[in-house]
Amino acid sequence: MNGGKECDGGDKEGGLPAIQVPVGWQRRVDQNGVLYVSPSGSLLSCLEQVKTYLLTDGTCKCGLECPLILPKVFNFDPGAAVKQRTAEDVKADEDVTKLCIHKRKIIAVATLHKSMEAPHPSLVLTSPGGGTNATPVVPSRAATPRSVRNKSHEGITNSVMPECKNPFKLMIGSSNAMGRLYVQELPGSQQQELHPVYPRQRLGSSEHGQKSPFRGSHGGLPSPASSGSQIYGDGSISPRTDPLGSPDVFTRSNPGFHGAPNSSPIHLNRTPLSPPSVMLHGSPVQSSCAMAGRTNIPLSPTLTTKSPVMKKPMCNFSTNMEIPRAMFHHKPPQGPPPPPPPSCALQKKPLTSEKDPLGILDPIPSKPVNQNPVIINPTSFHSNVHSQVPMMNVSMPPAVVPLPSNLPLPTVKPGHMNHGSHVQRVQHSASTSLSPSPVTSPVHMMGTGIGRIEASPQRSRSSSTSSDHGNFMMPPVGPQATSSGIKVPPRSPRSTIGSPRPSMPSSPSTKSDGHHQYKDIPNPLIAGISNVLNTPSSAAFPTASAGSSSVKSQPGLLGMPLNQILNQHNAASFPASSLLSAAAKAQLANQNKLAGNNSSSSSNSGAVAGSGNTEGHSTLNTMFPPTANMLLPTGEGQSGRAALRDKLMSQQKDALRKRKQPPTTVLSLLRQSQMDSSAVPKPGPDLLRKQGQGSFPISSMSQLLQSMSCQSSHLSSNSTPGCGASNTALPCSANQLHFTDPSMNSSVLQNIPLRGEAVHCHNANTNFVHSNSPVPNHHLAGLINQIQASGNCGMLSQSGMALGNSLHPNPPQSRISTSSTPVIPNSIVSSYNQTSSEAGGSGPSSSIAIAGTNHPAITKTTSVLQDGVIVTTAAGNPLQSQLPIGSDFPFVGQEHALHFPSNSTSNNHLPHPLNPSLLSSLPISLPVNQQHLLNQNLLNILQPSAGEGDMSSINNTLSNHQLTHLQSLLNNNQMFPPNQQQQQLLQGYQNLQAFQGQSTIPCPANNNPMACLFQNFQVRMQEDAALLNKRISTQPGLTALPENPNTTLPPFQDTPCELQPRIDPSLGQQVKDGLVVGGPGDASVDAIYKAVVDAASKGMQVVITTAVNSTTQISPIPALSAMSAFTASIGDPLNLSSAVSAVIHGRNMGGVDHDGRLRNSRGARLPKNLDHGKNVNEGDGFEYFKSASCHTSKKQWDGEQSPRGERNRWKYEEFLDHPGHIHSSPCHERPNNVSTLPFLPGEQHPILLPPRNCPGDKILEENFRYNNYKRTMMSFKERLENTVERCAHINGNRPRQSRGFGELLSTAKQDLVLEEQSPSSSNSLENSLVKDYIHYNGDFNAKSVNGCVPSPSDAKSISSEDDLRNPDSPSSNELIHYRPRTFNVGDLVWGQIKGLTSWPGKLVREDDVHNSCQQSPEEGKVEPEKLKTLTEGLEAYSRVRKRNRKSGKLNNHLEAAIHEAMSELDKMSGTVHQIPQGDRQMRPPKPKRRKISR
């Protein structure tokens, strides 16, 4: 109909230069172009639509002059001069509304249809193109709808699909088309997507709001949904508006025809921003406003704006057009139900009603749907709303009082038929809106009203809203409840998902999938974001956010980012929706599988998505999340996200300002960036995805979002210095930012982690970086919580948020910490990935959480939120926990990691690696719905990180960057000063950071952060301090580091666990082990163990990160792993040391191998860095490794040194086999560490060394190192346990551990080793990764059964891990595959490879460890015939564990968790990891081979 030919850009049709807007009509100019809002609320975005509209029966043509000259009356040229409206005009408009039967009917019909048109939403959704909106609206005119639908489809396809293939857009379009956005909504929606700022302005423009009939306010506020809905029928519009978001809802609440009141309220709401826009367009309008005001006001609108802008497809008009028709007929044709059903079909995923296809309208969908096509709109709109409004709401409320205004707006027009829609909308609104307490009032009323409106549109908005508010708030956790979220139940998967995702994804299918997928992921994200937004607003909300958010938000976060990322991925420019539509569908489908939380996500998504957070969140954090804050900026959710981000930004701003002076600018940038991010998140994320997204672009939505955000930020604001150009905008941005303030790292990190998440949403990177200074702080106080709660942390956000909040809500710093923590949780995945990619500095760091300096942190870090975001709520050890968590992929993590890595990457040409890492992180993040996935992701990230770390080793600068990254992580940890130790560590880290910041390039600096981190981990490092220092001295880069770190770390050395001497990267790895180990380590171990056990007993997942090289090895370990590590650590420190020693030995080999790979790939540079980075392990060991790694090919590694080489090679190979997969880099590091740890005085070491092809003296050196590492070994052992997969290599290297790992790795692994270089041999491992891995680790692996090269079992391990985490998420697998590469030399990665089932030398008595290392060189050999199935390995592991229990205090909870994990792994991996029987047999005696197959 009207959408017959919805122009892609409503503004396409430039009318005459000067125009007079007809009485009763509104002309809105937003980014998407010009929208004409008819008295009935229809949105016309182009002459085509106008013609269709005018020719459509039942459409309101009041106010048009008699001789109607379309070009004269309707000018769609945004630049055209418009006759200023006078008060008279306004009054005339009102009169028209009074006189216009359409307007009155619309209200009445909307109300009526709300109750009777549940199917419409379907219809809306159904409209395939994204004209779902239109469809619903059109339903009454089947024919018209069809044409509209087609047009819509076209338009949407063009504008929405092409522009932003996001279901969001579609949804928005649908919503728009459906109802109110005929012109406006779509444009608004599109605007939202495309040009949030503009749309906000335009839609949000007072014009929009003013169009009483149109529900001007709705136009203004919830421009898209509201507009559309209102335009075509209040009822319809309402729903759509409702779905659209709180703003819309508000608008809707006020019947669309409340143009004036709506307008007013909208204005009011939007006052901070654009008047109505903000409110109105939760997404579009708000976007506009947000964009514009985002900087000033952390307005959801801003976020929204971004979203819409992103979604730029003005062509939403097509949908709109459709909607207009339907809308026009909305009232008349409440009957569009027929079309709606298709919508439903299209939106199949909708929860309940067609309307809810998006699931956004779940609560209100039925009524709204029933209400009329508009209702359908709501469905589609719902999505939109979710995306937009919720985002907006979430964002907005926090961002501005406007939300309340918004809410009030609805209140103003309580009776309008869109109530049903409104309800949804309100729900969104409420949820989102609710977020802000202040805003909530209105929002509550309005939101509830809207949300509740479903029952009675008019239902007292206040009452309803209130109800809804209360309802939505907590249950939906804000974001998800916003649209559908308000109603928890409505917030069904569909609802939530639909809401958030749908908003993002135009297509139902995508939406469904995405939504469902995002339900989990997006929702949490959204929830997180919502929380972020809401947290500040309402204390309750944050709580809900934390709780719900955690559950829902996380998915939202992840999901959102994914969607958004997808969105962005597809639509390089803005159309998150478009992109989301296509990419999201595909990825979401995967993710959906991955996201068992889909329903949850959906629910959450609804609320969160309703906020638009889902998408937005996605953009925002994280993937990780989001990973999330970046989410905010995502496509449709971008609006909400933008709003959220806005809010976060504003809070960030405050906190950051307080917290970080320098980044004030950054904040501005960030803000801008976020705004831009919102506007450009898609491109950014798209870029990011394209850049590093190959494998897992959306895996970590949070990260992607963050990336997007960052990119967007970086694109639009380039806020991150030098980060703007990085294709991993996020990484770049963040990196740049991070890098920008390397010296400020501590501050920045603190902020970044915090902001990384909160702001992260906006600018994952920028945010991070900006967050660096400003953002993190802004969260710090209230925002942090919000951010944490909100998906701002990205995927981890929700969990991280919740965790972070609960974990580190202590002080601002704590706050930061909290934020960081959540961020970290996100980061862990998100940041982590980035880091991983970068150099694993951050990535591995995130892992550090569990084994972090403070064991408690470890404990806390145990929370690997469902999303797999390893929240690692390390309360005890925020630093470590935070660090790792900080690297959690969500934002801090990813952002962090990305930031840091990006920093280093960016600066050191490592942006791409980081991106891949980031991407890899993202997928993990998302898929990490399962901790497994997350862990794997982390691992993956770690591996890439290790790769980067290797690079960093190779490249001092890179190392520096990594260090910076690490520092960022550390700073993140600093962010979590709540832990004294962590604080100490932070201090140390900060010092290191300062050092690093000062000498980012110096390898030591690079080592420092990680070293610090690891030192935290490495309690043992003290003992090794002398050696370490010596080693450090030996190592050029390390020299400085040891001094610096030692100087800075010594204080924390004991306290933090082992901040001290173990400064060099290799020590970092050792530190990781040492963390648990060491004199302080013992206590630390106990503390960690207790924390882990505590967490385990609480059912939390503990993530233990182990990094051999402080630079690149901070690998997150799943709770199981953490528990294992703890268990290992529980045992004799020495025992652990021994085990770790063995592990490290093997691991070092693996690390070296990885380094070798790096060298192979990096050539000379690696050796050089090896000297620097590898020096991390030890000069001697380094040399040895250098020789073997750098110069030694597979052959050398395999057995160039026959005598020791044979055995060691075997062990090493085995070790490498896992490390190749698990920790290629860590393997390298490990070997170095092993060298450092001359645990096996000559035999084992030589054995290990031979694989390394090290000279005897080197071996001696290594032995020396090994001895030094003895204690570290224990820590390492724990770490290895933690990083079982990483340890797999190490274990493989270790005689027994090797065996254990061999066992872990199935025969396939050996086969892989045999295949060593067959990239395909690694099932899940990405071929390229595998290739590189094999290239580096594989060469020597080729001949070694257990070579570092990811063997099939290793690959399988990863694959199974992937499967465990996200069986259906290809990204996840890719991520996992990347992971191996990310490990740096000496990285003690967990080997979160899927297949990593057991940790060969997990818990063993020292003598056992020694024996194992020394006496089992052969044992280290993994022979295919000896490889056992995972089950066998698990059984053996269990036996060993039981036996080990005596030496290691494995607590029942831990044990149970381990058992569960093992069984789970067994199920998932099955025979994937066949542990060599010999190894297994040998290993059983060795408890250290704990299988933490998490």
From Swiss-Prot:
BP-aspect Gene Ontology terms: glucose homeostasis; nervous system development; positive regulation of growth hormone receptor signaling pathway; regulation of behavior; regulation of multicellular organism growth
Miscellaneous field: Named 'methyl-CpG-binding domain protein' for homology to other methyl-CpG-binding domain proteins and the presence of an MBD domain, MBD5 and MBD6 may have evolutionarily lost the ability to bind methylated DNA and are recruited to heterochromatin by alternative signals.
This protein's name: Methyl-CpG-binding domain protein 5
PANTHER family: METHYL-CPG BINDING PROTEIN, DROSOPHILA, METHYL-CPG-BINDING DOMAIN PROTEIN 5
Gene3D superfamilies linked: 2.30.30.140
Biased composition regions of type Pro residues, renumbered to the chain: 333-343
Chain positions covered by the region annotation Required for interaction with ASXL1/2/3: 57-68
Occurrences of domain PWWP (ranges): 1385-1409
Consequence when changing A655T: In MRD1; uncertain significance
Chain intervals with Low complexity compositional bias: 499-511, 594-612, 836-848
Organism lineage string: Eukaryota, Metazoa, Chordata, Craniata, Vertebrata
Assigned keywords, A-Z: Chromosome, Intellectual disability, Nucleus, Ubl conjugation pathway
UniProt subunit comment: Core component of the polycomb repressive deubiquitinase (PR-DUB) complex, at least composed of BAP1, one of ASXL1, ASXL2 or (probably) ASXL3, and one of MBD5 or MBD6. Distinct combinations of ASXL and MBD proteins may preferentially bind specific histone modification marks. The PR-DUB core associates with a number of accessory proteins, including FOXK1, FOXK2, KDM1B, HCFC1 and OGT; KDM1B specifically associates with ASXL2 PR-DUB complexes.
Domain notes: The MBD may lack methyl-binding activity.
Species annotation: Homo sapiens
InterPro entries the record matches: DNA-bd_dom_sf, Methyl_CpG_DNA-bd, PWWP_dom
Pathological condition linked to this protein in its record: Intellectual developmental disorder, autosomal dominant 1: A disorder characterized by significantly below average general intellectual functioning associated with impairments in adaptive behavior and manifested during the developmental period.
